[in-house]
Amino acid sequence: MTSRVMVLGVGAFAHAVQSILQEDGAETACYLTRPYGHYGPSALGQTWSAEDHPSPLPLFEKFKPDLIIPQAVAWAEQPWAADLVQQGWPIFSPVNDAMRIEISRQESSELCRQYGIPVPAFHHVQNRLEARKIMQDDPRPYVLKNPICSPFSPIHAIICESVADTLGWIERVDYAEGLFLQEYLGKEEAGHFVFISGGEISSLVTNQEFKRAFTGDMGPLAGAPLAGIVEQDPEDKYGLARELIHPLKPWLEKTGYTGPLQVTAIRKNGVWHAIEYNIRLGVTTTALLLRMLKNPLQTLLNVVRNQTTVLEWSPEKNFGCSLTLAGYGYPYVVPSVPKLPVEVSTPLECDLWWNEVDEDSGQLYMANHQNYEMGHRIADVNACAPDMYSAVKLIGNEIRKLRCLASYYRLDLKELADKNLSLFSSVKNNL
């Protein structure tokens, strides 16, 4: 019997997940959670928008999914979330108290301290006066974040590399939901994904994401990475899971944690420090991870059913890279952007996942939403290969086939790969 999968999301994430799982035999549909990024998922089959269907529960009753994959943790904030959990729908996410490890940055950091996991110094304040007091009592460079992890939070991460940077930004941020200050530890950053099911923690991949908008790691942090590198790592070669996830096992068992878990960490003085946990498949990493697995559909079904999972990997896809084509003005506010055509000169020899594009009479255009006056992410181009530099070369060749006026992509993927190799070689030498 064909397994049914419903994705809660939009853009390249929904496009990629549906396409790859369809290739593996699934029937898919998509609940479009945001008012943009509909073209990719809509090209693959049945979709419903949250604007027309405020609750997806009646759609679940109709479609009867075997697996529900959310793009963001924001689903848990919806008025229908409690009913989804109570009714036992197969959501690919931990639920209830297990979600707190991502949702609350302070609780996550305190949990790490409880189990002996290194974390940066941190403070949670409610207003500007409290932030000034922290800088008076404990002056350091801090990364400024919203205390509650949500894509709709008023603050997106601001990395301050000096005390002066921090003093400047605490005067400008929006304190509507408070402010989380996390000590800045440097740039040796990496992430690691695991699946937790059947009482086991199964390592998957180690990744790096590059969120600076421009080549050379310059410009502001974008809302999502502009580039990414992923490596199959079921043996946890760099110790990220061993040091930052496995110590949490008593808490994972206590909360009944089932699903994906990612840790993002920074290495300082030879020690990994946990800076963030995510309870979902990553926007950048998911499509590459699913490509690397020989049987992605059955693997996800085993996890959501809390069964022991045997991972099978494609050796010809040991490494993967992702590169985003960003539209005119991204990531800044740019009013009155016209409907700019997007052209593909010849079919790509790797994956192309559409983000914010619209179709009109067979022609694709960069989205130009009247209420979202920012440059947009047009597409993600992904490539897998047996080695990292082959993936880098392939993706660099293929993204050139895309054209949209004044669009851009990062030109330093090879340099990022060099830094990736240097970092992880150093880590392995010190283990």
Predicted feature residues:
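ATP-binding N-terminal substructure of ATP-dependent carboxylate-amine bond-forming enzymes
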Residues: M1-V95
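Short acidic-hydrophobic, aromatic-tinged amphipathic segments that line or gate anion-handling sites
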Residues: G45-P56, F122-N127, I158-E161
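A conserved helix-loop-beta module that forms one wall/lid of the active-site cleft
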Residues: P94-A157, A326
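Internal nucleotide-binding/catalytic subdomain
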Residues: I155-G282
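Short, conserved charged micro-motifs
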Residues: D165-G168, D236-Y238, P331-V334, P386-K393
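Active-site "cap" helix and flanking loop/linker of ATP-utilizing ligase/carboxylase catalytic domains
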Residues: A241-Q262, N278-D351, E356-E359
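C-terminal hydrophobic structural anchor segments
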Residues: V333-V392
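Generic C-terminus detector
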Residues: A367, Y372-L431
